[in-house]
């Protein structure tokens, strides 16, 4: 089973392009259908308890990569983790108020989409703000033998990329695309499909 973990917005629609290429046995988390937690590890436990099957692959986008790290450490040590442009919380982020981070992240296109989704009651702003807070407070411990990391190389500044301090071996794939577009990028989708199908990269 492949488990998909969205970014801090928390809605599985971010995986729409990828989902059309994956096998049927896929579960996508939707944070807006779950109880809000005070710690990222608690959210990981909640998601793990609700799964029908153990995942063989966990694909986490942005915030979802950090959540996937916790799931692999705590619940599914044999699962393969793919972090899609996920980063560690920097000191500057930890010091920035949650509301300010949220406003900094918004673009016009995203804001329009968020407004529509809130009107449809598909997403809830308190859940998004809580996810930002969970990430800011996250204190990861070295745990994993290996993981796959897709890194966006366009417009990526002031981010903490010290995953090598926590993961013994990182398979890195660079994509020349900005963070908001990475889950629609054809090279990234192709890479993820090959990974989950067990294709060997030369």
Feature locations, PLM:
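A hydrolase-biased, glycine/serine/histidine/acidic-enriched motif that marks catalytic-domain neighborhoods
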Residues: 1-202
